Structures are given as structure tokens and as C-alpha cells.
């Protein structure tokens, strides 16, 4: 099993694949004229606009659900792993993939809004929907929905719950079995409450956990502020093989930085579009901009917080390709949350293990919530027009079982399975958004045109020549009749 998964990951995450992902993000950046810079202010403004409705959630709730998926163990364990095997230069490549990935997140989330539907009284959308309605290739849409369902329900929850269990056992001595039981009870309470309960939980937990984590990192940075020039220099020199110690790791720095960056911020992965489609907005681009900014929050803020805590304190190990250590400050500590714990303990003795365990719990738990929502959306797609009550119940039980199983299985297998699930989804979604870039670009131009006229943009797909955007055609007709 482990050998097969390793072989699959070697193909899904080979070096040419990574460069292709970078190239696609850069191409979208050029096509949108680097909207991630031009519309930075608008991204922030749109986060707090819009209200929830019976069918949809507010922009902030959609952002919170998306961030609950983006901000997970990758922000703590993933960053540490990238530094361990790619050196400090991997941090730069995580930043790079976030910057250009914001354009990919914009495209996929705008597409999710354009082709969303109102199904069973709720807004639904995502890659499966825009593949079928935008490309007209139903088998491809079904393939993505099936892949997403398998990844989100079976493969990915274990990565998160495993990290929670390991952190809690290390900090408080509580067995993984007990942690697993507690996780299942709490998760069950939330997911059996439906989308609204997930949205409400996310909007309460996510801001609290992200701000608290970033504040602690700022305290550590201030206490080690004299190291700032050296750390920034080390990151940039290591990223481009200009540092003598890390010069031989440039390929690994790019590979680990991009892989862990994508794993963390999910830009182009096809997960963010699901909550994006649920937002109640007057124009698809509004939510596209919000989701682009969520990539910044995840990587430039939260991942950077972890990286800076580790690098400012020097609490990390980095291995060369032959297994020898280039940096070996933490003997006997495996790459992962232990780096962050040691970094915090070096400044605030005795505080590291407990804080990281609590942070991991919140980060990972909300991510599992998001996984459920994504899996539920894809079941809704596959079951359209048919009774899905029992399928939804089965999904809830499966994701609860996968979460429990993850607490007691090995971390290496958990991460390998997670990488495989992510890799499959990335490739199916990337093919789709490359082929469907035009509708998203047309929507962006339309939005910018209306903003220049001083209007609050509304969306008329027919005027732009965008077909099969049935929800928006009805919405525009209804709005026109209301105004007239």
C-alpha cells in the first residue's frame, strides 16, 4: 500500500508537474493583469459585504469556510516539513505560489459562482458543476466529483486528525483513542447541523485561531528582532542557491515550497470553489476576489508566522538529499509540529507543546469541517434529481470513521494518502480552469467596467455571451423586473 502511494505521488508531484502549476498561476496572473495587486483593496472591502440568505451564506461566511479548509496542519506541520527537506528557501517558494496562486483561486472561485445552481433550497457549485455546464463534458464532471468525494471523505481527514492526536498526546499525555472519540463527537454535532451550522462555526473559530497564532509569532519576532535581516537574507539566498550551505537544495526548495504551499493554500486545487459558490453576491467576481485574498491570509500570514517562529529562533533541522544534516539543531525531533513547539519553548519555556496542540486542534478540526462540506456538495452533484438522504447520512458516518482512524494510524501514511488525494484533484481541476478561463476573464472585465461607472456590479451572463449560467440568467431577469 505504502509503496503504491509513494509511486503515485512521484508521478503526481514530479518536478515537471510543479513547474506546470507555477506556469499556470503565472499565466492567470498575466491574463488578469495581476489582479492580486491591482484589486487588493477591493478584496478586503468585499470580505465584509453581503448578507446570508435562506439559500446562501455571506461573503465572510464563505471566506471562513474556505479558510477553514485552507488553514490546517499544512500551516504548522507542512511548513516545518518544507524547511526540513527544502531548507529556508522553501519559504520563498511558498510565498511565490501564494502570490501567483491567488490568480488561480480567483479564476476557479469566479467560475464556481458563474455556474452555481440552486439545489434543494441551497446554492451549490464547484468544479463538477462548472465542468459540466461550462465545458459540457459530463463524464469529466462525474470523475472530478468522485475523486473529490474519495479524497475529502476517505483520504484527507486522516492527515488532520493524526496531527491533532499527536499534538495532544505530546502536550497533555492523552491517548489518540480518547482524542479520536472526542473529535468524532464534536465533529458529528457540527456536520449533522447542516451547512448553516458549519458556516456559523467557521466564522466564529477561524478569525480567532488565525489572529491568535499570528500574534504569538509577532511576539517571537519582536523578541528576536535583531535576527530579521539575517533571516530574510537566508530565505532569499537559499531560494536561489546563493547560500553556500543550502546551495545544493534549490530543486528541493522549489519542490517542497510549491507542494506544501499548494497543500496549504489550496489555490487551483478545486476545494475553495465549493464554499465560494455558496456566497450570496450580486456578481461572481466579488467572491472571486474574496477567495483570492484568502490565499494571502493562509500563506503570507499564517504560514509565514510558522516559518518566522522556526527560523528566527533557529529551531529546525534540514537534511540534504543523501540524508545528511545541513542544519541539526533539534536532535531526535522529527520534521513537523515539533519544530514549532521548540521555537516557542525557546522563547516562552513550557508554553510550546500546549499552544501548538491547541492551535493544531483548531486548524485541523475546522479543516475536517470544510472537507465534509466539499464532499457533501459533490454528493449533491452526483445525486441531482434523486433522493440523497441516505447518501448524505453515509457520508457523515464515513468521514467520522476516517477522522477516528486517522488518529491511530502512522503520520507518514496519512501524509502520503493526503498528497495523493490532493494531487488527483489538482490535476482534474487545473485542466478544467485552463479550458474555462475565458468566462472568468469576461466576468472580470464586466465587473471592472461597472465599477468605473460608479455602479454596484450585477451580472448578466447573456450580455457577455456566457452560456448555461442558468442561475444568473434568472437572477438578472428578476432584478430587471424588480427595478422596472
Swiss-Prot record:
GO cellular component, one term: plasma membrane
InterPro entries attached to this UniProt entry: Na/Ala_symport
Lipid bilayer topology: Multi-pass membrane protein
Compartment(s) of residence: Cell membrane
GO molecular function, one term: amino acid:sodium symporter activity
Principal subcellular localization: membrane
Keyword Cytoplasm: no
Family recorded in the similarity comment: Belongs to the alanine or glycine:cation symporter (AGCS) (TC 2.A.25) family.
Record's protein name: Putative sodium/proton-dependent alanine carrier protein YrbD
Amino acid at each position: 500500500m505504502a509503496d503504491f502511494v509513494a509511486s503515485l505521488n512521484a508521478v503526481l508531484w514530479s518536478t515537471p508537474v510543479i513547474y506546470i502549476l507555477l506556469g499556470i498561476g503565472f499565466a492567470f496572473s498575466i491574463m488578469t493583469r495581476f489582479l492580486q495587486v491591482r484589486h487588493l483593496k477591493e478584496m478586503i472591502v468585499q470580505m465584509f459585504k453581503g448578507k446570508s440568505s435562506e439559500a446562501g451564506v455571506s461573503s465572510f461566511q464563505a471566506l471562513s469556510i474556505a479558510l477553514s479548509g485552507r488553514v490546517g496542519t499544512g500551516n504548522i506541520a507542512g511548513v516545518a516539513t518544507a524547511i526540513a527537506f527544502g531548507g529556508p528557501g522553501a519559504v520563498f517558494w511558498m510565498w511565490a505560489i501564494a502570490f501567483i496562486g491567488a490568480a488561480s483561486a480567483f479564476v476557479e472561485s469566479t467560475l464556481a459562482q458563474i455556474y452555481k445552481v440552486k439545489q434543494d433550497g441551497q446554492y451549490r457549485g464547484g468544479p463538477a458543476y462548472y465542468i459540466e455546464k461550462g465545458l459540457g463534458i459530463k463524464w469529466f464532471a462525474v470523475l472530478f466529483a468522485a475523486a473529490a468525494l474519495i479524497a475529502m471523505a476517505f483520504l484527507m481527514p486522516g492527515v488532520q486528525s493524526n496531527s491533532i492526536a499527536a499534538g495532544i498526546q505530546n502536550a497533555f499525555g492523552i491517548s489518540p483513542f480518547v482524542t479520536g472519540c472526542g473529535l468524532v463527537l464534536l465533529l458529528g454535532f457540527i456536520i449533522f447541523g447542516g451547512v448553516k451550522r458549519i458556516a456559523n462555526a467557521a466564522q466564529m473559530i477561524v478569525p480567532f485561531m488565525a489572529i491568535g497564532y499570528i500574534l504569538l509569532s509577532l511576539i517571537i519576532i519582536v523578541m528576536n528582532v535583531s535576527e530579521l535581516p539575517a533571516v530574510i537574507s537566508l530565505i532569499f539566498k537559499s531560494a536561489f542557491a546563493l547560500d553556500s550551505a543550502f546551495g545544493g537544495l534549490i530543486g528541493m526548495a522549489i519542490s517542497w515550497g510549491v507542494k506544501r504551499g499548494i497543500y496549504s493554500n489550496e489555490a487551483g486545487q478545486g476545494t475553495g470553489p465549493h464554499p465560494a459558490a455558496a456566497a450570496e453576491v450580486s456578481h461572481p467576481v466579488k467572491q472571486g476576489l474574496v477567495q483570492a485574498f484568502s490565499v494571502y491570509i493562509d500563506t503570507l500570514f499564517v504560514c509565514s508566522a510558522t516559518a518566522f517562529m522556526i527560523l528566527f529562533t533557529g529551531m529546525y533541522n534540514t537534511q540534504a538529499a543523501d540524508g545528511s544534516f545541513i542544519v541539526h539543531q533539534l536532535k531526535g525531533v522529527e520534521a513537523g509540529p515539533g519544530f514549532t513547539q521548540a521555537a516557542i519553548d525557546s522563547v516562552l519555556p513550557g508554553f510550546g507543546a500546549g499552544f501548538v496542540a491547541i492551535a493544531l486542534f483548531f486548524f485541523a478540526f475546522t479543516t475536517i469541517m470544510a472537507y465534509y462540506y466539499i464532499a457533501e456538495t459533490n454528493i449533491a452533484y452526483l445525486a441531482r434529481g434523486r433522493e440523497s438522504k441516505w447518501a448524505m447520512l453515509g457520508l457523515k458516518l464515513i468521514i467520522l470513521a476516517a477522522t477516528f482512524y486517522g488518529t491511530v494510524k502512522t503520520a507518514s501514511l496519512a501524509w502520503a494518502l493526503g498528497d495523493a488525494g490532493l494531487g488527483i484533484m489538482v490535476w482534474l481541476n487545473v485542466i478544467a480552469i485552463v479550458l474555462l478561463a475565458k468566462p472568468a476573464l469576461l466576468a472580470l472585465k464586466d465587473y471592472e467596467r461597472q465599477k468605473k461607472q460608479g455602479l454596484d456590479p450585477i451580472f448578466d451572463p447573456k450580455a457577455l455571451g456566457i452560456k448555461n449560467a442558468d442561475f444568473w440568467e434568472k437572477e438578472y431577469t428578476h432584478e430587471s423586473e424588480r427595478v422596472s
